[in-house]
Amino acid sequence: MLKQVEIFTDGSCLGNPGPGGYGAIMRYRQHEKTFSAGYRLTTNNRMELMAAIVALEALKEHCEVVLSTDSQYVRQGITQWIHNWKKRGWKTAEKKPVKNVDLWQRLDAALGQHKIKWEWVKGHAGHPENERCDELARAAASHPTLDDVGYLPES
């Protein structure tokens, strides 16, 4: 039987683009692990993606996951849009390159053999784990230490 894991995620950006961070909480039974990091220049969507990626990449075996995010971009991207992006060689319906393709590809790879249920939660609405992830993300964004090498400012 697969382990049942809960993951909660959030991303934050102080300015968009600007310094950003992500926060994630992973819970298995009574065990809990948190993840966060801050980047000097990035976007809120990239940080939302990173939160999910880092938590999923930390799983050491195939799991049944409920992943909660307040990002419609992440939830819709992974449950709806990604299938056509892949069919079109990572291009949008308008034949433009998919934004944040480096992270979408990394998230796609991180899904692995996991069975994942994507849940959307309303942000800043008192959801305890989402609020904690928001705090982790904002604290990381306030003290960025990393460069988001995949971030490509729009020209």
UniProtKB/Swiss-Prot annotation:
Record-linked SUPFAM superfamilies? Ribonuclease H-like
What EC number(s) does this enzyme carry? 3.1.26.4
Q: Quickly give the catalysed reaction.
A: Endonucleolytic cleavage to 5'-phosphomonoester
**Which UniProt keywords are given for this protein, alphabetically ordered?**
Cytoplasm, Endonuclease, Hydrolase, Magnesium, Metal-binding, Nuclease
Any one cellular-component term (Gene Ontology)? cytoplasm
Residues at which Mg(2+) 1 binds = D10, E48, D70
Q: Name one GO biological process term.
A: DNA replication, removal of RNA primer
Entry cofactor note text? Binds 1 Mg(2+) ion per subunit. May bind a second metal ion at a regulatory site, or after substrate binding.
Cofactor(s) the record lists? Mg(2+)
Annotated ranges, domain RNase H type-1:
1-142
| Compartment(s) where it occurs, according to its Swiss-Prot or TrEMBL record | Cytoplasm
Q: What residues does Mg(2+) 2 bind to?
A: D10, D134
**Coarse class of the protein's main subcellular location:** cytoplasm
Q: Which Pfam families match?
A: RNase_H
The record's annotation in PANTHER family points to: RIBONUCLEASE H1 (PTHR10642:SF26)
Question: Which HAMAP family is this protein grouped with?
Answer: RNase_H
Q: Which family does it belong to?
A: Belongs to the RNase H family.
Q: How does it assemble?
A: Monomer.
Q: What is this protein called?
A: Ribonuclease H
